């Protein structure tokens, strides 16, 4: 299981991303529309004033059971360890172990 502090930090990042999403998109569209160099510099400065953790690229996918960030399966929102256990316990319908 991941440290509680890491999970909490990730949750706070998600809140920041949703809080500043509208402002960030407005500034990005302004940046594309403006042609003058000075205006672009002003917009860049405003973008840089947004907190670092408010950008979606700072987010990391985490397993909702353990909080593990590596070995994450997007389809299920689970890490590989939990996915394997749930498949063996028949908790994920339609998922079968492959054999060839």
UniProtKB/Swiss-Prot annotation:
Has the keyword Plastid been applied to this entry? yes
Q: Which GO terms describe its molecular function?
A: rRNA binding; structural constituent of ribosome
Q: Where in the cell is it found?
A: Plastid, Chloroplast
Signal peptide range in chain numbering: none
Keyword line: Chloroplast, Plastid, Ribonucleoprotein, Ribosomal protein, RNA-binding, rRNA-binding
Please list every transmembrane segment annotated in the UniProt record, as residue ranges. none
Top-level taxon of origin: Eukaryota
Q: Which GO terms describe its cellular component?
A: chloroplast; small ribosomal subunit
Where primarily located?
plastid
Q: A Pfam family this protein belongs to?
A: Ribosomal_S14
One BP annotation, GO? translation
Q: How does it assemble?
A: Part of the 30S ribosomal subunit.
Q: Which protein family is it in?
A: Belongs to the universal ribosomal protein uS14 family.
Role, per record: Binds 16S rRNA, required for the assembly of 30S particles.
Q: Which protein is depicted?
A: Small ribosomal subunit protein uS14c
**Record organism:** Guillardia theta (Cryptophyte)
Read off the lineage from the record.
Eukaryota, Cryptophyceae, Pyrenomonadales, Geminigeraceae, Guillardia
């Amino acid at each position: 299981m991941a440290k509680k502090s890491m999970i909490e930090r990730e949750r706070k990042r998600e809140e920041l991303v949703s809080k500043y999403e509208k402002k960030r998109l407005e500034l990005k569209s302004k940046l594309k529309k403006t042609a003058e160099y000075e205006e672009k510099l002003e917009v860049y400065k405003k973008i840089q004033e947004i907190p670092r953790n408010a950008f979606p690229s700072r987010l990391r996918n985490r397993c909702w059971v353990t909080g593990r960030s590596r070995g994450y399966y997007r389809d299920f929102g689970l890490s590989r360890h939990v996915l394997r256990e749930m498949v063996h316990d028949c908790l994920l319908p339609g998922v079968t172990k492959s054999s060839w």
